């Protein structure tokens, strides 16, 4: 081959003088095959699959913290923003942030805030990856139409998902329907309703092209696409005032539910009574007698449909230690470190301090290592996490008051009260309450979705040298479960005037959690639904998109404002630094986006200076 190329070059040099200057110029233009462009990047179907895989990785960063940068949380990780940082459910840990730096100190926010730009960029990057995969699918040959249709449907799912989140969070946004590699400065904002229509079209096509169930764990299928289609229908119904979209949402939600029934019985690891009396790693019991179906959903080894979990719609597959090591050409503990909740920031009032036990626990405290392997660095204490995030009183206390207390989701197996862990303290083993602490705002219950209630299931390789297991390492994360689909169904039915059916959908989720309180039709409203979403989906759902889609663009989002006024950390929970509810109903368009768009006007959202 090399000899042939040289011969061709000699011939070209000999005849070159016969060509005009134009031909000379054409001859000088190079087309090196080692430089990939959109025109030559795709030559076989596996490259399209690789591009689709890239969209999954981009989506992963919208649900979990993956880069191991503990300070990335406060420089604006898109995942933490979407998951509700600064909303009614989650805020920065009070030991780290203060009223001045907290997102829920809404008076301090402006369009320069890095969270808005990082979220904007991440969502548009995901859309670009999806558009490139769709483009590439038409450039190659396929072994079958089914193979092509499946991958294109996955790409359309991600294209729709990215614009669904953009429209929910920012309202009207520039809509780029096809892959574009040209640098532009003249984008205009497409009306929110038109963006939602684009989302719906692509999700409907994704539903048609996807299989009932994914061939590989972590991939999306009909259930996930129909779930987000139901959400898009609801959003469009709110935006346009056309109630027919709520009927469509009901149909889409039911399509998902028929494929993915709730897990109503105990299942998987730690659920077999025959394992009672046996222990696993670190001598921790294999059987959790106090578990429940809800508890089982969040155990390592129980997340995927292939593991027996019919409720699972879409799972973010977190690499194991060995997979991380292979990808990084060496051993690595790098994983999710930002969000696990630590005990270590609790500080006694003077009357509770004792000579040999100065705190609820301390690094030097004498702890029962059989009960708490790794001591203060164990998973129940935050593991290797810096505890960047903390739960608000709303999801720790408010939603469990009165008749709502009896609930598997409120049990000590899944939502754990801090206890005195220092064996030298006279209150060893007792539950800590806020009135014992110098800074009650640091108090939080520990979610078993984030921390684990014990060290069962950790790979022994995943232990930070001299400390405990890296928080959440090797643990998968739900992007969607059919329990949330029931809550979308409840909202669609309520908005369509069918409160009886809405209560039925809510109660299906509550019955699974063995709740003593069930809803009547007269009790159902949007606040009821938001409360139930908090009980079922805390630390899981994209809370800000849920709140921001509750009003038509240009109108005041009263439900969101009331929710934040009542429950946001630095509006309600912190009595020393009370703030105010936001004046805006949508996130700010990032200032740099407006400034760089010199070829067309990019107006800012209402309520932002």
Give a label for each model feature.
Residues 167-168, 172-174, 214, 235-242, ...:
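Short coil/turn linking the two alpha-helices of tandem helical-hairpin repeats
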Residues 37, 43-51, 57-68, 89-170, ...:
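Conserved, well-structured interaction surfaces
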Residues 22-93, 240-429:
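An aromatic- and glycine-enriched ligand-binding surface/loop that stacks and positions planar moieties
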Residues 113, 371-509:
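C-terminal substrate/ligand-recognition segments
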Residues 20-22, 123, 198, 276-358, ...:
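Long, intrinsically disordered, low-complexity segments
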């Amino acid at each position: 081959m090399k000899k042939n190329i040289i011969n061709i070059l000699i011939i070209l040099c000999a005849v070159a003088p016969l060509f005009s200057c134009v031909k000379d110029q054409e001859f000088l233009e190079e087309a090196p095959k080692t430089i990939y462009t959109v025109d030559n990047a795709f030559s076989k179907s596996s490259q399209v699959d690789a591009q689709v895989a890239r969209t999954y990785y981009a989506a992963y960063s919208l649900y979990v913290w993956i880069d191991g940068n503990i300070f990335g949380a406060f420089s604006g990780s898109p995942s933490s923003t979407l998951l509700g940082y600064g909303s009614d459910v989650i805020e920065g840990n009070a030991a780290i942030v203060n009223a001045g730096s907290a997102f829920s100190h809404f008076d301090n926010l402006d369009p320069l805030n890095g969270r808005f730009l990082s979220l904007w960029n991440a969502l548009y990057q995901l859309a670009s990856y999806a558009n490139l995969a769709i483009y590439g699918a038409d450039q190659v040959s396929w072994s079958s139409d089914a193979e092509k249709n499946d991958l294109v449907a996955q790409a359309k799912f991600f294209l729709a998902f990215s614009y669904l989140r953009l429209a929910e969070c920012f309202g009207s946004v520039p809509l780029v329907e096809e892959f574009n590699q040209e640098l532009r400065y003249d984008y205009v904002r497409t009306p929110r309703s038109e963006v939602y229509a684009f989302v719906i079209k692509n999700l409907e096509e994704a539903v048609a092209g996807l299989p009932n169930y994914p061939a590989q764990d972590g991939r999306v299928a009909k259930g996930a696409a129909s779930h987000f289609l139901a959400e898009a229908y609801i959003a469009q119904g709110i935006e346009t005032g056309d109630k027919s979209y709520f009927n469509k949402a009901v149909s889409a939600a039911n399509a998902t539910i028929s494929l993915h029934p709730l897990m109503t019985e105990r299942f998987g690891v730690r659920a077999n009574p025959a394992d009672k009396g046996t222990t696993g790693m670190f001598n921790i019991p294999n059987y959790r007698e106090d578990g429940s179906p809800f508890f089982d959903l969040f155990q390592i080894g129980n997340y995927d449909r292939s593991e027996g979990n019919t409720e699972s719609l879409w799972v973010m597959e977190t690499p194991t230690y060995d997979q991380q090591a292979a990808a990084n050409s060496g051993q690595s503990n790098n994983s999710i470190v930002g969000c696990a909740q630590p005990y270590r920031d609790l500080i006694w009032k003077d009357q509770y301090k004792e000579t040999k036990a100065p705190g609820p626990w301390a690094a030097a405290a004498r702890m029962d290592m059989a009960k708490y392997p790794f001591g203060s660095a164990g998973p129940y204490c935050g593991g290797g996490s810096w505890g960047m995030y903390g739960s608000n009183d709303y999801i720790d206390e408010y939603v469990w008051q009165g008749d709502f207390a009896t609930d598997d989701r409120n049990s000590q197996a899944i939502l754990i009260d801090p206890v005195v862990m220092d064996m030298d303290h006279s209150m060893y083993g007792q539950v800590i309450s806020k009135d014992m602490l110098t800074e009650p705002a640091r108090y939080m219950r520990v979610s078993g979705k984030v921390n684990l209630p014990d060290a069962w299931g950790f790979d022994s390789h995943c232990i930070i040298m001299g400390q405990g297991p890296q928080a959440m390492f090797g643990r998968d994360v739900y992007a969607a479960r059919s329990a949330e689909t029931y809550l979308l169904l409840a909202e669609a039915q309520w908005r369509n005037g069918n409160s009886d059916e809405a209560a039925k959908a809510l109660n299906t989720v509550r019955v699974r959690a063995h709740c003593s309180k069930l809803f009547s039709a007269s009790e159902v409203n949007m606040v009821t639904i938001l409360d139930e979403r908090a009980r079922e989906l805390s630390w899981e759902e994209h809370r800000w998109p849920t709140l921001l889609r509750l009003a038509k663009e240009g109108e005041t989002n009263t439900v969101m404002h009331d929710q934040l006024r009542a429950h946001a950390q630095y509006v309600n929970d912190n009595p020393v630094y009370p703030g105010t509810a936001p004046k805006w109903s949508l996130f700010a368009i990032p200032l740099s986006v407006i400034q760089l768009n010199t070829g067309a006007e990019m107006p800012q959202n209402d309520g932002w200076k």
